[in-house]
Amino acid sequence: MSKQQAQFTNPETPGYVGFANLPNQVHRKSVRKGFEFTLMVVGESGLGKSTLINSLFLTDLYPERVVPGAADKIERTVEIEASTVEIEERGVKLRLTVVDTPGYGDAMNCVDCFKPIISYVDNQFERYLHDESGLNRRHIVDNRVHCCFYFISPFGHGLKPLDVEFMKALHNKVNIVPVIAKADTLTLRERERLKRRVLDEIEEHGIKIYQLPDAESDEDEDFKEQTRLLKASIPFTVVGSNQLIEAKGKKVRGRLYPWGVVEVENPEHNDFLKLRTMLITHMQDLQEVTQDLHYENFRSERLKKGVASKVENVEVTKDQILQEKEAELRRMQEMIARMQAQMQIQSQSGDAQHL
């Protein structure tokens, strides 16, 4: 048998076709193409959003910001800043876009502060819809927001009115993951109490947050347990730090206090590792929910509005045609009346001449 023939012999048992290798083909294609993911972070200044994002992806994506003073907050407006970075790990490329919202919740009057954020989300849907409807659909860049980390202050007793308004305004457009920031300012008991309070208020106000899918029945027990723990950890209480400090003879990222060290990646100290695990293991699901639920809802609404406007235009056109015909009929009637009047005058003048 030649080498060429040997390459096409069936290495498996008789009756094996080879469909089982399809997932490997999809995996290889996906790895070559790379992955795209857009994460939005929303919350008041001073909650450590930039630090947490840098800690999550081990990159200096965002510089540390100066927290604005009281005078600066009076007329503070919300800005939208999108930063993209290419991350490669073991041959797998991730095009990560992080959308930051500096100024959110900082002004004295925060009534409309989330409207620029909603406009940004809708604009990304609109852009994707436009590209998807175009001729060149092979190289569409997906800038839709796949996930939103919403940062909740640890210094309150639950959700603020602004938190409720924002999440209710956005929960049908984006996968919202609530995050309680600066967990190192709370005791373990205070964390659990605040978590329960936030979850109760989320349910009370009918806010839809991202629901982690249940593990399949054929998944191994470790994955099922991991899924159970991740679900039980929502909202995640996290600590972020980019500083390496020495603890128990090893270098760790954390925060040093007079009473000890808070380690960022220690699950006994905070939920940082759980949050990162959730994001990495459910990145595909977050994208699918964005595509199948949020984007489809947006697309359906746009199509309905398009059809409604066309029907309205048709009705307007019919009314215009009818009005034009009525006007033309009136003009003809007036013209006939004038002609009859002229004929009558001519007839009367002719009779007078005969007399």
UniProtKB/Swiss-Prot annotation:
Supply one GO molecular-function term. Answer: GTP binding
Tell me the SUPFAM superfamilies matching this sequence: P-loop containing nucleoside triphosphate hydrolases
* Sites marked Important for dimerization: 155
One Pfam family matching this protein: Septin
Annotated source species: Xenopus tropicalis (Western clawed frog)
Q: Which UniProt keywords apply?
A: Cell cycle, Cell division, Cell membrane, Cell projection, Cytoplasm, Cytoskeleton, GTP-binding, Membrane, Mitosis, Nucleotide-binding
The listed locations are: Cytoplasm; Cytoplasm, Cytoskeleton; Cytoplasm, Cytoskeleton, Spindle; Cleavage furrow
Q: Which family does it belong to?
A: Belongs to the TRAFAC class TrmE-Era-EngA-EngB-Septin-like GTPase superfamily. Septin GTPase family.
Q: Which residue ranges are recorded for the region named Important for dimerization?
A: 259-269
Protein name in UniProt: Septin-2B
- Name any GO cellular component annotation: cleavage furrow
Region ranges (G1 motif)? 43-50
Gene, per the UniProt record: sept2-B
Q: Where does GTP bind?
A: 43-50, 77, 103, 182-190, 240, 255
